[in-house]
């Protein structure tokens, strides 16, 4: 009853959001159809009051005054007694088809329903209306308070939900910030590791390049070593072959230098003088050593290897030594002489010639005689030979002849050097002739 008189001036929030309200006694309007305004509500209440008055008037016209006054507080009516003690039924108008008790119950119910709002007494109708209006105002105010309370509750619920959402979002933001910090630190670690890996890669690359370069150098050095070993082996074989083949040729070289006059004039003197024979023997050994040291033909294969001149090497091998060529050209007529035992005569003449040259060089001053370069070299060699004669044990202690120093590089000037050697030999021969004169 109080709910029907309240104003629904606001819409329900839950109904607007979800389209349905789960509250059974909702004081908010569910849509514009239920939304009422104060003017419409007052007119509707006034109209309802007018209809009620008309119904009361129509009802009072047909009923008794006692019925109109209501008998809920009145004592029950009893019939009067006659003299004999019987109850007398008074006349109550025309008989009605409805029993009296039923009619009384019906009236009672109707009067009770109407008395809830107003008093049917004539003098209290205005006061009851005022009280009804005051009660309606209180009910309206109470309903408005209820509306505000409901709205306040809804707002509190919304605030609580928003607060929960805020807390949840803040926790999520904190988790995300923590994850961001972790990822940032991880990225920094990876960048640092990447820098280290780059440095290591550059170091390994440089080391690999250096290793490859050094390995290439090692391979080249190994190839050079193999070529040098092969070259040295070839030179050793050539030198041993040349020394073995030139032992007999050196004697002929020393013998060809001596003239025929010296040979024929000194044979008897050499045969009768044992001291001179010993000196001549030592002179022969000195000359042999001199020839091995200064007149040995140097191999030219060393200078020609690697230049594509293998043909020159073969020609040098096939060509006879320069000393043999010179002796064959100079003394071809002398070799066709009348000597039968050429080796014996030449050996003795060589010994005598060396002995005489040594004596003549001692007795002659440096101002009276000009010494040539070849004779000076021979003189130095004689001094070395004399020291060997004085120390025979030292000479016997080293039976092997010391090898000459490595030959210089010989190219196109080899032939010119050989010509110079030939010229020196001719000059030496002339000097020998002058000494003999």
UniProtKB/Swiss-Prot annotation:
Positions with biased composition (Acidic residues): 333-343, 383-392
GO molecular-function term, one example from the UniProt record: zinc ion binding
Modified residues (Phosphoserine): 259
Pfam short name (any one): zf-CCCH
UniProtKB keywords: Coiled coil, DNA-binding, Metal-binding, Phosphoprotein, Zinc, Zinc-finger
Biased composition (Basic and acidic residues): 48-85, 307-319, 426-437
Zinc finger (C3H1-type): 6-33
Region (Disordered) location: 35-107, 266-360, 380-437
Residue stretches in coiled coil: 145-244
Highest rank taxon of the organism: Eukaryota
UniProt name for this protein: Zinc finger CCCH domain-containing protein 40
Organism: Arabidopsis thaliana (Mouse-ear cress)
């Amino acid at each position: 009853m109080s709910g029907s008189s309240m104003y629904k001036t606001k819409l329900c929030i839950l109904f607007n959001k979800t389209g349905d309200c789960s509250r059974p006694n909702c004081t908010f309007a569910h849509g514009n159809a239920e939304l009422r305004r104060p003017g419409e509500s007052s007119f509707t209440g006034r109209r309802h009051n007018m209809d009620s008055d008309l119904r009361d008037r129509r009802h009072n016209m047909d009923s008794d005054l006692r019925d109109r006054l209501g008998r809920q507080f009145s004592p029950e009516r009893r019939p009067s007694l006659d003299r004999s003690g019987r109850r007398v039924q008074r006349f109550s108008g025309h008989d009605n088809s409805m029993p009296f008790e039923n009619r009384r119950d019906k009236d009672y119910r109707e009067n009770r329903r109407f008395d809830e709002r107003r008093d049917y007494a004539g003098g209290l109708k205005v006061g009851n209306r005022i009280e009804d209006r005051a009660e309606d105002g209180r009910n309206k105010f109470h309903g408005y308070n209820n509306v505000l309370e409901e709205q306040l509750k809804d707002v509190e619920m919304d605030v609580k939900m928003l607060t929960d959402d805020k807390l949840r979002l803040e926790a999520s933001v904190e988790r995300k910030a923590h994850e961001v910090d972790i990822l940032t630190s991880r990225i920094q670690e990876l960048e640092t590791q990447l820098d280290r890996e780059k440095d290591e890669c550059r170091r390994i690359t440089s080391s690999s390049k250096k290793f490859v370069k050094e390995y290439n150098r090692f391979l080249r050095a190994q190839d050079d070593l193999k070529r040098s070993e092969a070259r040295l082996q070839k030179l050793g074989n050539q030198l041993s072959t040349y020394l073995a083949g030139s032992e007999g040729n050196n004697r002929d070289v020393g013998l060809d230098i001596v003239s025929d006059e010296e040979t024929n004039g000194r044979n008897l003197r050499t045969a009768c003088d044992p001291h001179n024979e010993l000196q001549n023997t030592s002179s022969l050994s000195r000359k042999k050593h001199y020839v091995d040291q200064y007149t040995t033909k140097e191999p030219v294969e060393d200078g020609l290897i690697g230049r594509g001149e293998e043909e020159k090497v073969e020609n040098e091998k096939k060509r006879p030594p320069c000393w043999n060529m010179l002796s064959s050209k100079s003394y071809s007529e002398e070799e066709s002489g009348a000597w039968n035992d050429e080796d014996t005569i030449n050996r003795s003449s060589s010994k005598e010639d060396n002995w005489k040259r040594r004596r003549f060089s001692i007795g002659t001053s440096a101002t009276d005689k000009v010494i040539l370069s070849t004779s000076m070299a021979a003189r130095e060699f004689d001094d070395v030979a004399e020291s060997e004669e004085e120390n025979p044990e030292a000479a016997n202690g080293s039976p092997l002849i010391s090898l000459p120093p490595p030959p210089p590089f010989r190219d196109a000037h080899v032939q010119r050097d050989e010509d110079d050697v030939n010229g020196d030999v001719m000059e030496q021969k002339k000097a020998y002739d002058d000494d003999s004169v």
